[in-house]
């Protein structure tokens, strides 16, 4: 549509994977209309919301749906860990090696971003995975901070995968945070301190193992539509194309007048989308 970033708020049903709400902007006021377009029974049936760490969104949900459980998205937690811990330690280690004159080690670790964030299967059968794992083991033995970061990431992933009880999740998360603070790795300590503030939302993943991964997958389809629509200045028509893109094959969906009145849509948006 335009250059630079323009954000929108998207709500998707985790079961049907169909969009429920789409609005231009990512502020709290852009999320508020979602709670006025469906019936009271619909909102009472909502048990949990999975979202990123946008405090404005969580504040709106807490105020509008006090009975709803907010789940801090696993995808964004691990993404933050990769960016704020693993990549930060990798860059710091690369700069240290350059100052020490170890240029080969510096270049090797600078080019290992994908390798350091890769999650290997429990049983490795692929030869390329074997060689990559051996290379990772060598780098971990040469650098203590990287070794700690990789092991702590694996413990965090195992915690998300294995815990389906809130008490066990809370205990495991508290233990993980203590280990992170005692590690002595500055990036890991800062990460643990920040995420400790969202402990309850992280623990809620044990009660409702959902994430915004569905939305992240939908974003790939929306990005394709955005490239096709580059130069088009009608956001209402662009949003209509997004609604249409997620229709199941062989079905029809009537767009609610009330939904599109919120977007100030033109008459074309009030027709049936096929």
Located regions from the model:
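Acidic/histidine-rich catalytic cores and adjacent linkers
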Residues: 2-5, 9, 13-17, 24, ...
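Short alpha-helix plus adjacent loop in nuclease-associated cores
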Residues: 77-98
